[in-house]
């Protein structure tokens, strides 16, 4: 157990995959998973941590299959952006039910549904202790929600991007296929590139590297893992400029 009662981070950008919300359902949003995640985020807020949140849309829409069938990539990406807004609405509602103040911002204008993204307003809301959910990716096609997470993380001057996954961190091989795969506890950005480890897409990863934004990959399905990460305890994989 950590002897340090204070959080290791002041402001974080938490990236959740859309698939994380579907639980064992295989599609859509599992209400029990949504509620558990809202409670874990509430814990961070109660610790005094400022939380920005980016959620993917893969549980509601997957464009790859339709793209193969001939759908225009731009159209598919716009549909994916709307899927992230739907997930954001669900998360905002779950946080409100958990008595956590939250604001949903969209990179594309959706008047009457949620606020349009504003950097100054986002900073103001974070300082006021509200969770800010950033939806619709970057607002541009061809950019992933991982890119959106790194971009928003840099913009709000987050201390770290916390990438929540279904495995315990970054491994030398796929741990689902190889149970003997080795977990890395710490990596430099260059090591990730040299070893061709799958952390996030290259555009997102190099954006984080170029702006010296650390990334911590951890298992959101592991009870208490998010809190341990926040408290600076060894959990998951930390990717940063080693030596800093």
Swiss-Prot record:
One Pfam family linked to the record: AA_kinase
The enzyme's E.C. designation: 2.7.4.22
Keyword Hydrolase listed: no
GO molecular function: ATP binding; UMP kinase activity
Regulation: Allosterically activated by GTP. Inhibited by UTP.
Annotated ATP binding sites: 15-18, 58, 62, 165, 171, 174
Gene Ontology cellular component list: cytosol
Compartment(s) where it occurs, according to its Swiss-Prot or TrEMBL record: Cytoplasm
Chain intervals for the UniProt region annotation (Involved in allosteric activation by GTP): 23-28
Any Gene Ontology biological process: UDP biosynthetic process
Pathway named in the protein's UniProt entry: Pyrimidine metabolism; CTP biosynthesis via de novo pathway; UDP from UMP (UMPK route): step 1/1
SUPFAM superfamilies: Carbamate kinase-like (SSF53633)
Catalytic activity annotation: UMP + ATP = UDP + ADP
Chief location category: cytoplasm
Keywords: Allosteric enzyme, ATP-binding, Cytoplasm, Kinase, Nucleotide-binding, Pyrimidine biosynthesis, Transferase
Keyword flag Kinase: yes
Enzyme kind, highest EC tier: transferase
Binding site for UMP: 57, 77, 138-145
Database matches in PANTHER family: URIDYLATE KINASE (PTHR42833), URIDYLATE KINASE PUMPKIN, CHLOROPLASTIC (PTHR42833:SF4)
Role description: Catalyzes the reversible phosphorylation of UMP to UDP.
Family: Belongs to the UMP kinase family.
UniProt subunit comment: Homohexamer.
Protein name: Uridylate kinase
Source organism per UniProt: Aeromonas salmonicida (strain A449)
